[in-house]
Amino acid sequence: MIGGLFIYNHKGEVLISRVYRDDIGRNAVDAFRVNVIHARQQVRSPVTNIARTSFFHVKRSNIWLAAVTKQNVNAAMVFEFLYKMCDVMAAYFGKISEENIKNNFVLIYELLDEILDFGYPQNSETGALKTFITQQGIKSQHQTKEEQSQITSQVTGQIGWRREGIKYRRNELFLDVLESVNLLMSPQGQVLSAHVSGRVVMKSYLSGMPECKFGMNDKIVIEKQGKGTADETSKSGKQSIAIDDCTFHQCVRLSKFDSERSISFIPPDGEFELMRYRTTKDIILPFRVIPLVREVGRTKLEVKVVIKSNFKPSLLAQKIEVRIPTPLNTSGVQVICMKGKAKYKASENAIVWKIKRMAGMKESQISAEIELLPTNDKKKWARPPISMNFEVPFAPSGLKVRYLKVFEPKLNYSDHDVIKWVRYIGRSGIYETRC
């Protein structure tokens, strides 16, 4: 499994070093520094093989985390551990920086002792770790038998992600459906590729050990090898959603999801990611971009771009930004826009059009005259795609929360006693239209 873990600063100096296997020597530290951190060319691959040794590395600000092994390991598992390690450190001392790591090096070694056992990842849940590793990294020597039994049951039992005895004056549950819609469209309006990457993030401030049940669209189709029935609708008339793949937090009971398409779980305390999913079928495209580019001789271009919002009139899109590329030999630009503000940025070779808000089923347009410098280059302008950024208050995949129920039999509070909030946020990923 993992033979060693090293944490470096931007100079390549080792801040944290822990070796778990005898086959990892001191030369591994120097090899990573020379071949990755101080490499003449930027290393783009997150996995680097040097002398039959594999280095799995991630970077946070100016800090490098590198897991080293000489064995054939599961790469996804190693990266999951590295990202979890970053989350745990951030939960304990905030920003991952050289100063914070030096100030908390004792705490980090304690965390590594609990998270990795002879190179095998064990317990990386922040809630469980904070039960027996304090903020200062000093373990309490005066624990009662009851406290010790709680720690043991949490670490080794079925519910390692939540400790017992949590109490809140007001029980609250916040659920965010966060989606990123990606699109590539032809100038004629044909969708060349489109997909949505989504996350369901929950903030749980509930007392005791509550049972939560979360239901989505009446019918969810989990696609397998590209086959499915995405266009089916349930008997109640509500549209189904076809999910290509999804992953869940370890607290979710998968047997319930397979049989009922509902998500049952005992949530961790605080913020966590309940599920992550991806879909490519029946996507609601929030905006359509209609470009028109006309060449007037060799020294002038006329550009007209229309954007149309494709959602309910009662909803408002925000933070809208359209980037219209211009040729490298542009000498001047005159812009007229119906709404918002537009500006030519010579350093980026683009016209940037910003609109604060736009309601659904509306359209707006921008016109520009682009003056070009004479050039001897016979190669025609490649016409890069027009890109767009935005934020909308709905899920482009069509995912909807039907219900969110909470039960806590021991403390005798019911679903009606819990304050619940559900929010949908759809953002643009790579949203481009060719022109």
UniProtKB/Swiss-Prot annotation:
Any one GO molecular-function label of the UniProt entry: disordered domain specific binding
Plastid as UniProt keyword: no
Species annotation: Rattus norvegicus (Rat)
Tissue distribution: Detected in brain.
Domain MHD: 170-434
Nuclease as UniProt keyword: no
Annotated Gene Ontology cellular component terms: AP-2 adaptor complex; clathrin-coated pit; cytoplasmic vesicle; extrinsic component of presynaptic endocytic zone membrane; glutamatergic synapse; plasma membrane; postsynapse; synapse
PTM field: Phosphorylation at Thr-156 increases the affinity of the AP-2 complex for cargo membrane proteins during the initial stages of endocytosis.
Domain of life from the UniProt record: Eukaryota
Assembly mode: Adaptor protein complex 2 (AP-2) is a heterotetramer composed of two large adaptins (alpha-type subunit AP2A1 or AP2A2 and beta-type subunit AP2B1), a medium adaptin (mu-type subunit AP2M1) and a small adaptin (sigma-type subunit AP2S1). Interacts with ATP6V1H and MEGF10. Interacts with EGFR and TTGN1. Interacts with F2R. Interacts with PIP5K1C; tyrosine phosphorylation of PIP5K1C weakens the interaction. Interacts with KIAA0319; required for clathrin-mediated endocytosis of KIAA0319. Interacts with DVL2 (via DEP domain).
Residue positions binding a 1,2-diacyl-sn-glycero-3-phospho-(1D-myo-inositol-3,4,5-trisphosphate): 341, 345, 354
Annotated keywords: Cell membrane, Coated pit, Endocytosis, Lipid-binding, Membrane, Phosphoprotein, Protein transport, Transport
Effect after changing residue 176 to A: Abolishes interaction with TTGN1 and EGFR
Subcellular compartments: Cell membrane; Membrane, Coated pit
Phosphoserine, modified sites: 45
Primary gene name: Ap2m1
GO BP terms: clathrin-dependent endocytosis; intracellular protein transport; negative regulation of protein localization to plasma membrane; positive regulation of receptor internalization; positive regulation of synaptic vesicle endocytosis; postsynaptic neurotransmitter receptor internalization; protein-containing complex assembly; receptor internalization
Protein name from the UniProt record: AP-2 complex subunit mu
Function: Component of the adaptor protein complex 2 (AP-2). Adaptor protein complexes function in protein transport via transport vesicles in different membrane traffic pathways. Adaptor protein complexes are vesicle coat components and appear to be involved in cargo selection and vesicle formation. AP-2 is involved in clathrin-dependent endocytosis in which cargo proteins are incorporated into vesicles surrounded by clathrin (clathrin-coated vesicles, CCVs) which are destined for fusion with the early endosome.
InterPro entries according to UniProt: Adaptor_comp_med_subunit, AP2_Mu_C_sf, AP2_Mu_N, AP_mu_sigma_su, Clathrin_mu, Clathrin_mu_CS, Longin-like_dom_sf, MHD
Membrane topology, from the record: Peripheral membrane protein
Similarity comment: Belongs to the adaptor complexes medium subunit family.
Residues bearing the modification Phosphothreonine: 156
Alphabetical list of Pfam families matching this protein: Adap_comp_sub (PF00928), Clat_adaptor_s (PF01217)
